[in-house]
């Protein structure tokens, strides 16, 4: 066989392997997808036993020049497919009673892929369709930061056309512990090794877990401000508990009694959006439950035709779960505040936003740790508008950090996807909110 024929054969084989990860049709969606979707695995570690699964969706605008985002869901252990379907992707799930076939999908109007390329990553290992070839060892915040950095380096080496695109690391909820540390890791990696460097520009976080012990204490003043507890509960709590409402000293019996009263008042409040009907998110199989779509996404992702369409490795995964709560995990980053500070010193842009009806990570807590950074505000607290209506409030700081609230928003973008999209669109374009 001539050298030329061998080369052509290798070229055809390479093209076949590459095109095998391109997804043009999805069960439940009528016709070909109106966007470019690639799925695949990247091995992590020396032996590549950890296999991170990703969805890559090209920008619908100008993929060659638009920003590249890497999106991480929270949990830890929640699949990025939830981000695609419920928060900021180009397809969503129709609210229909499950009939045994793959649930139906529809095109969204609020996808961030309208002006950005996005890598949606299933991490840590064990979440979504990511898996390990060997039994999963206990992982944690720090090890996942390093693994995700390795993933990004390898992904870019396979997609070198995106090296020059501005990179932003984005996520929400528990990824508030991972994203700032990952930004620092990428930044330091650019100095230590690797040519060309990753074109890191900044990061974006929604209702981020940042310092859990600190943040939980703000649930009580938030509940009081929203009228969930009375003066008779709040004023003594403030005085007797000294601002420490969690991990209460067992000898402080008065504080313990008051916290019991608080829990009685809020036990049936949906912590992710206080105006949303409460139902058990671990049992969402009833169509009457607000979170019934969480059941539908599990039905969809566990459909064999869906797995074939997404090119899921056969035998790599049992039942897909929206959030895998069984992953052995060390919460070894206590606070991500120092990472925010270091990233600001390095000159990276950041947008921190809060749905103002979230009590899990109240906007009061996020404002408090931002204040602790002691950065000068560029402008005073002001409303930001959509169609001449207030969509939230914002303040920008001298360290390139912007804080914004989303009026009526909850713990994730799914509660106000259109407003979150417009906020993202303005910020990523360098416009004031």
Swiss-Prot record:
Active-site residues are: 173, 358, 411
GO biological process, any:
proteolysis
Compartment list: Vacuole
Q: Name one GO cellular component term.
A: vacuole
Which E.C. number(s) belong to this protein? 2.3.1.92, 2.3.1.103
Q: What happens when the gene is disrupted?
A: Plants do not contain sinapoylmalate and accumulate its biosynthetic precursor, sinapoylglucose.
- Per its Swiss-Prot or TrEMBL record, what regulates the activity? 95% inhibition by diisopropyl fluorophosphate (DFP) and 30% by phenylmethylsulfonyl fluoride (PMSF).
Task: Give the UniProt keywords, A-Z.
Answer: Acyltransferase, Disulfide bond, Glycoprotein, Signal, Transferase, Vacuole
The free-text tissue note of the record is:
Highly expressed in seedlings. Expressed in leaves, stems, flowers and siliques, and at low levels in roots.
Detail the disulphide connectivity of this chain as listed in its UniProt entry.
Answer: 78-323, 241-255, 279-289
Q: Name one GO molecular function term.
A: sinapoylglucose-malate O-sinapoyltransferase activity
Similarity comment text for this entry: Belongs to the peptidase S10 family.
Q: What else is known?
A: In cv. Pna-10, this protein SCP8 and the adjacent SCP10 are not present due to a natural 13-kb deletion.
Name recorded for this polypeptide: Serine carboxypeptidase-like 8
């Amino acid at each position: 066989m001539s050298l030329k024929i061998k080369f052509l054969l290798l070229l055809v084989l390479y093209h076949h392997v590459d095109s095998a990860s391109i997804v043009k049709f999805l069960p439940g969606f009528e016709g070909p997808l109106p966007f470019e979707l690639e799925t695949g695995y990247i091995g992590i570690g020396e032996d590549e036993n950890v296999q991170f699964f990703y969805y890559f969706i090209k920008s619908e605008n100008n993929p060659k020049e638009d920003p590249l985002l890497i999106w991480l869901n929270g949990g830890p252990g929640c699949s990025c497919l939830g981000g695609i379907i419920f928060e900021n992707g180009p397809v969503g799930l129709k609210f229909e009673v499950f009939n045994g076939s793959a649930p139906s999908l529809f095109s969204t109007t609020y996808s961030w892929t309208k002006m950005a390329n996005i890598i949606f990553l299933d991490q840590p290992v064990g979440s979504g369709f990511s898996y390990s070839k060997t039994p999963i060892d206990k992982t944690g915040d720090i090890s996942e930061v390093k693994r995700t950095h390795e993933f990004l380096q390898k992904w870019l080496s396979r997609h070198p056309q995106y090296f020059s695109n501005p990179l932003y690391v984005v996520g929400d909820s528990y990824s508030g512990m991972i994203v700032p540390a990952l930004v620092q890791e990428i930044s330091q990696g650019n100095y230590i090794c690797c040519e060309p460097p990753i074109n890191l520009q900044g990061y974006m976080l929604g209702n981020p877990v940042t310092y859990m012990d600190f943040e939980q204490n703000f649930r009580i003043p938030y509940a009081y401000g929203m009228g969930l507890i009375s003066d008779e509960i709040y004023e003594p709590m403030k005085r007797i508990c000294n601002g420490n409402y969690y991990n209460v000293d067992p000898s402080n019996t008065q504080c313990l009694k008051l916290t019991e009263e608080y829990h009685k008042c809020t036990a049936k409040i949906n912590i992710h959006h206080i105006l949303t009907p409460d139902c058990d998110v671990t049992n969402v199989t009833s169509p009457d439950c607000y979170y019934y779509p969480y059941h539908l996404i599990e039905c969809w992702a566990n459909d064999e035709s869906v797995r074939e369409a997404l090119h899921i490795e056969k035998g790599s995964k049992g039942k897909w779960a929206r959030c895998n709560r069984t992953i052995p995990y060390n919460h070894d980053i206590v606070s991500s505040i120092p990472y925010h500070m270091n990233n600001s010193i390095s000159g990276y842009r950041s947008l921190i936003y809060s749905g103002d009806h979230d009590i899990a990570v109240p906007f009061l807590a996020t404002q408090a740790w931002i204040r602790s950074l002691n950065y000068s505000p560029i402008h005073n607290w002001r409303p930001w508008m959509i169609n001449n209506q207030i969509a939230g409030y914002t303040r920008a700081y001298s360290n390139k950090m912007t804080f914004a609230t989303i009026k009526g928003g909850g713990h994730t973008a799914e509660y106000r996807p259109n407003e979150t999209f417009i906020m993202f669109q303005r910020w990523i374009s360098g416009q004031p909110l």
